[in-house]
């Protein structure tokens, strides 16, 4: 049997570079070696593309020591990786690309744009859905137009804030009640997110968020449970059982996710049937609204007192580490990790084949 050549992208110019490496290592260890030839491609924090030549089990933060310069060609007549060694270029055919890039410059439509140009099938959402879901401000505005329930929010741009700081602080304090969350609009793994309980903390939180983006969100804090839902599919959509995150800290921060490791994941989440059904229906509606494909993890809040459901965000390349909710939810729902990867690759190929019927010329 001819093996499919699967290029796995990891790293990236992102605050989630290290998390991406852990996710990609997990993906590559669970890909069926009888079906796939794995081509590990790392992107450094500086944006250099390198073919990783070491062992998958040894992949860590020192991966660049075992690498060769490379890049994916945007030439769709090639559909290949270009390996550069001793000033000579060699083309390596690629059948599918599996981007395991979290955050900016990987999950935001940028890499997806390159892969569209290349014509190579790739796992996950396309350019538009990736960009929309990565930008929490646009995602919330679009969800608002469709009547999807969510907490009160305000979008602030850095240049406007710097010229009118007092105005924005007054506006926030008039529209919201403490505590509030302050988030970079384009960030993941809770990087740059703070919970502010008073004016002093608010000012510090805004400063922190602007370190990671030029656009931030102010969100009303809700006394809520954090519920996550895994979604799989293109036109036919599968929604997983629901999971609950019980943070070890005040909220599910970067430290709570990846450093202290003591946050609890409950699968399935213990919810009333009506609430569970509402979340699953909303997940499908949101998945279709953002034109997602392949996969996404959609996160919600459930008010602890009223059971009211609120949309939080969509992750188009969810974590694939050993502690990540997406593969755990799918496994609980009857799709083991290796089969999940098979399905994602199959969905990528199917989506690419559908595009082959699109005409790009009036001739012929």
Curated annotation (Swiss-Prot):
SUPFAM superfamilies: Glutathione synthetase ATP-binding domain-like, PreATP-grasp domain
GO cellular component, one term: cytosol
Keyword Membrane carried by entry: no
One Pfam family of this chain: Dala_Dala_lig_C
Catalytically driven reaction(s): 2 D-alanine + ATP = D-alanyl-D-alanine + ADP + phosphate + H(+)
Record pathway: Cell wall biogenesis; peptidoglycan biosynthesis
Needed co-factor(s): Mg(2+); Mn(2+)
Segments forming domain ATP-grasp: 140-346
Subcellular locations according to the entry: Cytoplasm
Any one biological process term the GO annotation gives: peptidoglycan biosynthetic process
Function text: Cell wall formation.
Family: Belongs to the D-alanine--D-alanine ligase family.
Listed name of the protein: D-alanine--D-alanine ligase
Annotated source species: Caldicellulosiruptor saccharolyticus (strain ATCC 43494 / DSM 8903 / Tp8T 6331)
């Amino acid at each position: 049997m001819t093996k499919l050549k699967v290029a796995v992208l990891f790293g990236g110019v992102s605050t989630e570079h290290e998390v991406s490496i852990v996710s990609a290592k997990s993906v590559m260890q669970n890909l069926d070696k009888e079906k796939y030839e794995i081509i590990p491609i790392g992107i450094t924090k500086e944006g250099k593309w390198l073919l990783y030549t070491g062992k998958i089990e040894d992949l860590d933060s020192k991966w660049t020591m075992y690498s060769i310069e490379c890049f994916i060609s945007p030439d769709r007549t090639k559909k290949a990786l270009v390996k550069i060694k001793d000033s000579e270029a060699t083309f390596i055919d690629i059948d599918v690309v599996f981007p395991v890039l979290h955050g900016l410059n990987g999950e935001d439509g940028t890499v997806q744009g390159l892969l569209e140009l290349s014509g190579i099938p790739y796992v996950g959402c396309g350019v538009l859905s990736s960009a929309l879901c990565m930008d929490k401000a646009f995602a919330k505005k679009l969800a608002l137009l469709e009547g999807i329930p969510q907490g009160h929010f305000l979008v602030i741009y850095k240049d406007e804030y710097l010229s009118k700081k007092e105005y924005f602080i007054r506006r926030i304090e008039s529209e919201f009640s403490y505590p509030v969350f302050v988030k970079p609009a384009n960030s993941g793994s809770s990087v740059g997110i703070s919970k502010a309980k008073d004016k002093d903390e608010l000012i510090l939180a805004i400063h922190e968020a602007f370190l990671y983006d030029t656009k931030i969100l102010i969100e009303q804090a809700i006394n809520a449970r954090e519920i996550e839902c895994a979604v799989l599919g293109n036109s036919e959509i599968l929604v997983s059982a629901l999971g609950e995150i019980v943070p070890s800290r005040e909220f599910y921060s970067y430290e709570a996710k990846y450093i202290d490791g003591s946050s609890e994941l409950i699968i399935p989440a213990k919810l009333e049937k009506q609430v569970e059904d509402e979340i699953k229906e909303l997940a499908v509606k949101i998945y279709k609204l953002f034109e997602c494909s392949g996969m996404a993890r959609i996160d919600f809040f459930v008010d602890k007192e009223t059971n009211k459901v609120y949309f939080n965000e969509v992750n188009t390349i969810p974590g694939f580490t050993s502690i990540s909710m997406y593969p755990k939810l799918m496994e609980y729902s009857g799709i083991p990790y290796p089969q999940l990867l098979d399905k994602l690759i199959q969905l990528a190929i199917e989506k690419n084949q559908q595009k082959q019927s699109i005409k790009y010329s009036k001739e012929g």
